[in-house]
Amino acid sequence: MTPEEFKKALEDKGYQISDHQMAQFATYYKMLVETNEHVNLTAITEENEVYLKHFYDSVTPLLEAPEYFKSGAELCDVGAGAGFPSLPMKILFPSLKVTIVDSLNKRITFLKTLVDQLELTDVTLVHDRAETFGAKKSVYREKFEIVTARAVARLSVLSELCIPLVKQNGFFIALKAANTEQELSDGKMAIAILGGKLIVDKDFALPATGDERHLVVVEKKKQTPNKYPRKPGTPGKDPIGKK
């Protein structure tokens, strides 16, 4: 997907993207590739691949599930790495107020430089483990209308890291590749215990390649019990509802 094809794909979905926004994506790509030479940010570095598998993939919540995004919404991105999915969404939908939490300081340093270069406002970067970031005494707990994750962790693990951060009546949106059926089956108990309810598992295909993608949307129905999230490392080693 070339930058021009990226622009057309967004226009086909009803998003008119300005020259300034396209320039922001071009700068993002340049900085990602340059920094990646000495900080491991991504295995994907070819321009066409980055525009499809990072930039387009990251904005799919806005394209495929726009009903969950209102102007000025507070969004938290857990384990964003090189800024995915939240910063491409911020470029496309500038009114979002974005908080990114990541456990690796090198990535946060890159993101600080990137946010400055892109002249993005209302972006907060936090170096922390998700388990402590959302703990019972954290100021960030149950603060966000939307929490996203595009991580490789299973849904049962991601739910424990993300749902505690969601306000009641807010949404946790997980960006997943194919085969979510088993993950949803394994994660059902965790979602319920943490105060969530599965709303939809929306499947769609990426343009150009037709690769399958899913958006799993969970609504926060009640407060998360204080004992969650458990201490760092525990959710991954011993997921809620593990058989």
Swiss-Prot record:
Entry's EC annotation: 2.1.1.-
Binding site for S-adenosyl-L-methionine: 79, 84, 130-131, 150
Gene Ontology molecular-function annotations: rRNA (guanine-N7-)-methyltransferase activity
UniProt keyword annotations, A-Z: Cytoplasm, Methyltransferase, rRNA processing, S-adenosyl-L-methionine, Transferase
Keyword S-adenosyl-L-methionine: yes
InterPro entries referenced in this protein's UniProt entry, alphabetically: rRNA_ssu_MeTfrase_G, SAM-dependent_MTases_sf
One GO term describing the cellular component: cytosol
Name of this chain's protein: Ribosomal RNA small subunit methyltransferase G
Entry's family note: Belongs to the methyltransferase superfamily. RNA methyltransferase RsmG family.
Coarse class of the protein's main subcellular location: cytoplasm
First-level EC class: transferase
